[in-house]
From Swiss-Prot:
It comes from the Eukaryota. Residues 1-20 form the signal peptide. CDD domains: FN3, M28_like. Its main location: secreted. Its cofactor is Zn(2+). This is Probable zinc metalloprotease SNOG_06590. The lineage of its organism: Eukaryota, Fungi, Dikarya, Ascomycota, Pezizomycotina. PROSITE patterns: FN3. One of its GO terms (biological process) is proteolysis. Zn(2+) 2 binds at D181, E226.
Length: 496
């Protein structure tokens, strides 16, 4: 009996040792290299993030926390900014907010020596299939355009929405906090959803007005967001109907608070939501994209990677965290109508959310304050977010356009990767770069400088097209780079 127990214990111990060991006992005497990067980069060099040049550093140094806070507090003072609220009251409602914002954008434009203009993009929305529109209402976007000096026909749009709502999406008569009946309150002054984004748009318009970007930048304040992204939809369709080249839309919606509902603080990160397969992509292109594993390299996600490279640094004191989603669960934002119009759009959002402060009546329940109030804001965080957006917009607006017709030859199966592309229109290109990364990496890790050519033959068998994701990007004056473009296969006859 003792002998049986002894052998059972020994067997169990041996089994446990075998299960816990990552190396089979027969090979325990052997060793093997464990490389962190695979495939081993034998071509090119490690890719480094782009730091701001002296001019951009000067822009970042001008971003004012005081200005951002003052804008938010002023927007809060209008009580409700509901899309259906008064448009004639000089002190309360969306009309008063619109008038004040227009004046502020115009004041910025006055310092631009004629380069910046302020316009209204207005339309009337009637009741019908939208249950949040209960009577005809004029909806007005404030559109502030800073014309580019060399390639004015390429636009980059940024901004947030200045309308607001509370728990009841059709309550448009709520007064400002302080006149609130706790038992029956439906009032809000809505500060970071989305006064925080509008404040950034206005602050950057003030600063950029004194500079001359090479391409056009549009600073917006959208209305009708809370009724179904109506303002952004109208502006996106207006651009589309007029064949305007919107090269990128950067939505700023909820960028003013670093704390979560449980008090967790994350003050140095900002989320960037990036859609995968384009919403308007045709089935043939999508099939090709999926066949090469390119669903993670949509224009939106490569724009996101570009933003990470130019805006995550010690000058912004922030790290951009890409989120591979169109938006948060069950939520939407003003970048979506641009995506639906065939443009590239992404959305900045603070790292954590407190749902007691979103779309809530301003009230106290069980000793806890609800509502979107000024005291919840982290103005230092909001200011750092503004620097991230400033770095993004300036870097995009001074870079060449993305290379066009980017392809990779798949005529035959071999160890070579032959790329071709055509030059973008507009700003001159000084050269091109091929970037690559392991398929599971979120960001580009390596870069090959190929010069001012329109093709390149990569002869390295270790950096095989089956094992990495490639991108091609333009490089312009001062080292400003475009977002990378995924090469699609050409010359293949099946499975592509």
């Amino acid at each position: 009996m003792r002998s049986s127990m002894f052998f059972a214990v020994c067997a169990a111990a041996a089994l446990q040792t075998a299960l816990s060991s990552p190396i089979h006992p027969r090979h325990a005497h052997q060793s093997f290299p464990n490389t962190e990067q695979w495939p081993i980069a034998t071509v090119g060099k490690a890719l480094k993030q782009q730091l701001p040049d002296e001019e951009l550093q000067g822009i970042l140094s001008q971003v004012s926390q005081d200005n951002i806070e003052a804008t938010i507090r002023k927007l809060a003072s209008f009580g409700t900014r509901h899309t259906l609220s008064s448009q004639t009251d000089p002190a309360r409602g969306i009309g008063a907010a619109r008038t004040w914002l227009t004046e502020q954008f115009q004041e910025a434009a006055d310092a631009s020596e004629g380069r910046m203009t302020v316009d209204w993009n207005s339309f009337v929305k009637y009741p019908g299939d939208n249950e949040r529109i209960i009577f005809p209402v004029n909806i007005t976007n404030i559109v502030t355009t800073l014309k580019g000096s060399e390639d004015p026909d390429r636009l980059y749009v940024t901004g947030g929405h200045y309308d607001s709502r509370n728990s009841n999406p059709i309550d448009y008569q709520g007064d400002a906090p302080g006149a609130v009946d706790v038992s029956n309150s439906c009032y809000t002054n809505w500060v970071w959803e989305d006064a925080s984004g509008v404040a950034v748009s206005l602050e950057l318009a003030r600063i950029f007005a004194k500079y001359q970007p090479k391409t056009t930048i549009v600073f917006t304040a959208f209305a009708g967001e809370e009724q179904g992204l109506l303002g952004a939809e109208n502006l996106a369709q207006t651009y589309k109907n007029n064949s305007v080249n919107v090269a990128g839309m950067i939505n700023l919606d909820m960028v003013g608070n670093s704390k979560a509902e449980d008090g967790t603080s994350d003050p140095y990160n900002i989320r960037l939501f990036c859609q995968g397969t384009p919403l308007t992509e045709n089935s043939t292109t999508t099939t090709s994209r999926l066949s090469i594993g390119g669903d993670n390299d949509s224009p939106a996600r490569n724009l996101g990677r570009h933003i990470y490279e130019v805006a995550s640094n010690a000058f912004t004191e922030m790290t951009v965290r890409l989120i591979y989603r169109l938006d948060r669960y069950s939520r939407g934002g003003d970048h979506r109508p641009f995506l639906e119009a065939g443009y590239t759009g992404v959305r900045f959002v603070q790292p954590n959310e407190d749902y007691t402060q979103q779309h809530q009546n301003v009230t106290v329940r069980n000793g806890k304050q609800y509502g979107d109030l000024v005291e919840w804001l982290d103005f230092e965080y909001n200011t750092r977010a503004a620097k991230v957006v400033a770095s993004t917009m300036w870097s995009l607006a001074n870079a060449p356009g993305e290379p066009m017709n980017v392809g990779i030859n798949t005529t035959t199966s071999d160890n070579f990767s032959q790329f071709k592309w055509t030059a973008p229109k507009g700003l001159p290109v000084e050269g091109y770069e091929i970037v690559y990364r392991e398929t599971l990496e979120p960001h580009w890790t390596s870069v090959i400088e190929v010069g001012d050519v329109n093709w390149y033959n990569l002869t390295s068998a270790t950096i095989h097209k089956d094992n990495v994701i490639f991108g091609v990007r333009s490089v312009g004056k001062g080292g400003y780079r475009s977002p990378a473009v995924l090469p699609f296969p050409f010359g293949c006859t099946r499975n592509c």
